[in-house]
Amino acid sequence: MAVISMKQLLEAGVHFGHQTRRWNPKMDRYIFTERNGIYIIDLQKTVKKVEEAYNFVRELAADGGKVLFVGTKKQAQDSVKEEAERCGMYYINQRWLGGTLTNFETIQKRIDRLKKLEKMEEDGTFDVLPKKEVILLKKEMERLEKFLGGIKDMNSLPDALFVIDPRKERIAIAEAHKLNIPIVAIVDTNCDPDEIDYVIPGNDDAIRAVKLLTGKMADAVVEATSGAGEEAEEVAEVTEETTA
């Protein structure tokens, strides 16, 4: 069965690209036609590309690989958080802090600070500190949680990035390139597909389109990790039978 159907893509508006004056000629191979000054993406190609990306993410996750979901534009923020959490992966949905990948040690220090503040709140330290100090510490904790909450359990660099709108997330793309981390991305008609390892040609501005495609990448992880659990159970059962 296909990973995604033309009907699903059409209903979510994945085929609507940008205005014809705002385009990247390299996306020509993924464009079906032009209608009322807007490029229409070739959904037959999108179906194939979603499948390629899905298979890549599934295999990566099955091998224990970790994916970082990145989407900081308003239309992507909720989907990125919800879908990454659903499949147990990491996410950044507010602002990409420069050096998140290339200066990972410094980011880790800020994450350690966040965890320390959370522990202080949990163990009652805040209750014995002066009120003014607690207000400042809570503000600091909220700010760190806002920007780093989605990666606070990421103890090493991710094995792949899933990005919504590579133009908007160009710093993340550049950092991933520098570290040879593969990139899967929703690529609209105004983006450069050559920067992306697994291109998903599609509308990166409509909430429904973003939700659908992000959900499919999360599904790939869920399929891989739940399958791994079943396999482990089967192995355990076989071991029990042979040792009995």
From Swiss-Prot:
Q: Name one GO biological process term.
A: translation
- Note the SUPFAM superfamilies from the entry: Ribosomal protein S2
Per its UniProt record, what InterPro entries does this chain match?
Ribosomal_uS2 (IPR001865), Ribosomal_uS2_bac/mit/plastid (IPR005706), Ribosomal_uS2_CS (IPR018130), Ribosomal_uS2_flav_dom_sf (IPR023591)
Q: Which CDD domains match?
A: RPS2
Which named protein is this?
Small ribosomal subunit protein uS2
- Please name the source species: Halalkalibacterium halodurans (strain ATCC BAA-125 / DSM 18197 / FERM 7344 / JCM 9153 / C-125) (Bacillus halodurans)
What PANTHER family would the database entry show? 30S RIBOSOMAL PROTEIN S2 PROKARYOTIC AND ORGANELLAR, SMALL RIBOSOMAL SUBUNIT PROTEIN US2M
Q: Which Gene3D superfamilies match?
A: Glucose-6-phosphate isomerase like protein, domain 1, Helix hairpin bin
Per the record, GO CC terms? cytosolic small ribosomal subunit
GO-annotated molecular function = structural constituent of ribosome
Q: Which family does it belong to?
A: Belongs to the universal ribosomal protein uS2 family.
Which keywords does the record carry? Answer: Ribonucleoprotein, Ribosomal protein
